[in-house]
UniProtKB/Swiss-Prot annotation:
NCBIfam families: met_syn_B12ind, PRK05222.1. This is 5-methyltetrahydropteroyltriglutamate--homocysteine methyltransferase. L-methionine binds at I431, G432, S433, E484, D599. The active site is at H694 (proton donor). One of its GO terms (molecular function) is zinc ion binding. Its EC number is 2.1.1.14. It catalyses: 5-methyltetrahydropteroyltri-L-glutamate + L-homocysteine = tetrahydropteroyltri-L-glutamate + L-methionine. 5-methyltetrahydropteroyltri-L-glutamate binds at R17, E18, L19, K20, K117, R515, C516, W561, E605. PANTHER family: 5-METHYLTETRAHYDROPTEROYLTRIGLUTAMATE--HOMOCYSTEINE METHYLTRANSFERASE (PTHR30519). Its cofactor is Zn(2+). Binds 1 zinc ion per subunit. The keyword Methyltransferase applies. Catalyzes the transfer of a methyl group from 5-methyltetrahydrofolate to homocysteine resulting in methionine formation. It comes from Shigella dysenteriae serotype 1 (strain Sd197).
């Protein structure tokens, strides 16, 4: 029984973000569709070849996406919302972009589809929309075309397809309500057709992703798997693929399915591989997800070998990444600024492929000598002074309940804040960032490269902050921001100023569409050597009589949007960050900043996938936020911002944050998120986002007024704020000015009654 290896997917964007650049050039009208498609072909060919050269046996095909793989699946099935359809009923790449962005080089603009987090990762998918009586047919043949490409290049191909039950689970019903699971029988013929086409091409194995099987699904959804897979059996071998958690709780459902193999995540799941081996049908292949696809740490291959060796030779076995390598940067070898010690601790996507090749070879040969050599840096790291800071550990151990309590309750604080700020009804503000123009990016890049000295850099940043204040005063906003010209990324910026983090040059991962992020890496205990945001906040406040918000990224979000350590708990990391940022709140307050926003957009996404594990996470997540904020005085107003969230199942925890004002993303969901706050009788102030910043479309005054009136039916008007959904970093100034002018006008109209 020869053991093979494979990956579940590979990063799409390219080492230098070639896909992002090609997408944005096409959207701006600076390149043709043919040029965009050519970049995709080139990236796919390069990535297949890189994996093959690194020693991967079975190459994933179908993991590439022009915007998002869930959206690709929606198009495959002919699931195109009416507002995004071409007049002739055809589907093309611009259809896909209209669903994702609200507009494309061709076709009429329309509201983009809702976007939300992919399970508990920092990747986003476009939510499929379902309407009653919907029809499905094979419409978008990207998967088949890419399989043909890979076969023509001589590769050993394993197509990747998002499974039918998970795809339905990820979607939402629009309009008249019905059970979306009732659509399952309508989409299965399309899946049958796709599998038949793959069989015609000589494909042996298809990776069919059903990550919903790691969730605590309702029984009706679990029951749907058997008839669905009965309908799909027989044409090719199916590798039922799960990730992000273990499968043991749903194993009875899984083992009843007519598939030929199962992939399990042995990094994030608690499954015992020997127990799995005993319970799986003896003729099934087991794909062991041993290499973490979601982090950057070198694997302890000695430990991985020990985890799997007892079933070697007892069943067909593949070794694999735990999940798609989409969530990992591409190549560590191009990182020239990391020192040798730290660099030796990491493995990016290509290095993970090498790990899989090494593990496969050792499992096949039985010669384990190479494993100890590979794992040696991991042993050295355990004793490194770069990792452990006794002062941080001592401060963390000394935290008391009092450290997470504001001095007084919200009602007392609100009175003090009203007296201090004297804001009008329907106060207007933005979420923090303003457009990151070419001039701003060039300024930062020149400074980073040493082409600009510190004085000239600071003069340039100060001028952009001044312009942001002028723009906001001209627009008539009530609470201002400094615009964050000095910040490349809301997490990276803080990580750069905190001890315990390191950074990469090219460690890009896709967040959504063309948006890429370069997460910091937490390598050790976290502390704040000096104030981070105080100087620029103080300068911005000196330019205006209106309040300017201090802007911090919260501890849970910094944790969730970084690559965390694996040698301590996430709770420990979050509380270390909270203590560092607590000092920042105190310093902002001392500098005269009266409104401080602590963004926690990632609070919900950090939830464990199983509800039974939620309480413990929410307890320490809320405590971390409160440790961060509780140092503030009564008349200092603490804001928090959350996006892409569904709140109704965590409202107790949202209220427990005890922020004075919460701003949330609601425009894409047509204010439906406010139902949670209404039903809970949320006591503090709320700013429901009134327009979608992910789309370049400018909302009308009437549209914004209508949303605010809808909000006021759920939340008392005296507790409502008026703001966009999210930061404006990715937008241009023309649409930003137009949208904010309409937003301010809508608020003024409502004040007049």
């Amino acid at each position: 029984m020869t053991i093979l290896n494979h990956t579940l997917g590979f990063p799409r964007v390219g080492l230098r973000r070639e896909l992002k650049k090609a997408q944005e050039s096409y959207w701006a009208g600076n390149s043709t569709r043919e040029e965009l498609l050519a970049v995709g072909r080139e990236l796919r060919a390069r990535h297949w070849d890189q994996q093959k050269q690194a020693g991967i046996d079975l190459l994933p095909v179908g993991d590439f996406a022009w915007y998002d793989h869930v959206l690709t699946t929606s198009l495959l099935l002919g699931n195109v919302p009416a507002r995004h359809q071409n007049k002739d009923g055809s589907v093309d790449i611009d259809t896909l972009f209209r669903i994702g962005r609200g507009r494309a080089p061709t076709g009429e603009p329309a509201a983009a589809a809702e976007m939300t987090k992919w399970f508990n990762t920092n990747y986003h998918y476009m939510v499929p929309e379902f309407v009653k009586g919907q029809q499905f047919k094979l419409t978008w043949t990207q998967l088949l075309e890419e399989v043909d490409e890979a076969l023509a290049l001589g590769h050993n191909v394993k197509p990747v397809l998002l499974g039918p039950v998970t795809w339905l689970w990820l979607g939402k019903v629009k309009g008249e309500q019905f059970d979306r699971l009732s659509l399952l029988n309508d989409i299965l013929p399309v899946y049958q057709q796709v599998l038949a086409e793959l069989a015609k091409r000589g494909i042996e194995w298809v990776q069919i992703d059903e990550p919903a099987l790691v969730l605590e699904l309702p029984q009706a959804w679990l029951d749907a798997y058997k008839p669905a897979y009965d309908a799909l059996q027989g044409q090719v071998k199916l590798l039922l693929t799960t990730y992000f958690e273990g499968v043991t709780p749903n194993l009875d459902t899984i083992t009843a399915l007519p598939v030929q193999g199962l992939h399990v995540d042995l990094v994030h799941g608690k499954d015992d591989v020997v127990e799995l081996h005993k319970r799986l049908p003896s003729d099934w292949l087991l794909s062991a997800g041993l290499i973490n696809g979601r982090n950057v740490w070198r694997a302890d291959l000695t430990e991985k070998y020990a985890q799997i060796k007892d079933i070697v030779g007892k069943r067909d076995l593949w070794v694999a990444s735990s999940c798609s390598l989409l969530h990992s940067p591409i190549d560590l070898s191009v990182e020239t600024r990391l020192d040798a010690e730290v660099k030796s601790w990491f493995a990016f996507a290509l290095q993970k492929c090498h790990e899989l090749a090494l593990l496969r070879d050792v499992l096949n040969s039985g010669d384990t000598a190479a494993l100890a050599e590979w794992s040696a840096p991991i042993q050295a790291r355990r004793h490194s002074t770069r990792v452990h800071n006794p002062a941080v550990e001592k401060r963390l151990a000394a935290i008391t309940a009092q450290d997470s309590q504001r001095a007084n309750v919200y009602e007392v604080r609100a009175e003090a804040q009203r007296a201090r700020f004297k804001l009008p009804a329907w106060p207007t503000t933005t979420i923090g960032s303003f457009p990151q123009t070419t001039e701003i990016r060039t300024l930062r890049l020149d400074f980073k490269k040493g082409n600009l000295d510190a004085n000239n850099y600071r003069t340039g940043i100060a001028e952009h902050i001044r312009q942001a204040i002028v723009e906001q005063e001209r627009l008539g906003l009530d609470v201002l921001v400094h615009g964050e010209a000095e910040r490349n990324d809301m997490v990276e910026y803080f990580g750069e100023h905190l001890d315990g983090f390191v950074f990469t040059q090219n460690g890009w991962v896709q967040s959504y569409g063309s948006r890429c992020v370069k997460p910091p890496i937490v390598i050790g205990d976290v502390s704040r050597p000096a104030p981070i945001t105080v100087e620029w906040a103080k300068y911005a406040q000196s330019l205006t009589d209106k309040p300017v918000k201090g802007m911090l990224t919260g501890p849970v979000t910094i944790l969730c949007w970084s690559f965390p350590r694996e040698d301590v708990s996430r709770e420990t990391i979050a509380k270390q960050i909270a203590l560092a940022l607590r000092d920042e709140v105190a310093d902002l307050e001392a500098a005269g900043i009266g409104i401080i926003q602590i963004d926690e957009p990632a609070l919900r996404e950090g939830l464990p996938l199983r509800r039974s594990d939620w309480d413990a996470y929410l307890q320490w997540g809320v405590e971390a936020f409160r440790i961060n904020a509780a140092v503030a005085k009564d008349d200092t107003q603490i804001h928090t911002h959350m996006c892409y969230c569904e709140f109704n199942d965590i409202m107790d925890s949202i209220a427990a944050l005890d922020a004075d004002v919460i701003t949330i993303e609601t425009s894409r969901s047509d204010m439906e998120l406010l139902e949670s706050f209404e039903e809970f009788d949320y006591p503090n102030e709320i700013g429901p986002g009134v327009y979608d910043i992910h789309s370049p479309n400018v909302p009308s005054v009437e549209w914004i007024e209508a949303l605010l009136k809808k909000a006021a039916k759920r939340i008392p008007a005296e507790r409502l704020w008026v703001n966009p959904d999210c930061g404006l970093k990715t937008r241009g100034w023309p649409e930003t000015r137009a949208a904010l002018a309409n937003m301010v006008q809508a608020a003024q109209n409502l004040r007049r009654g």
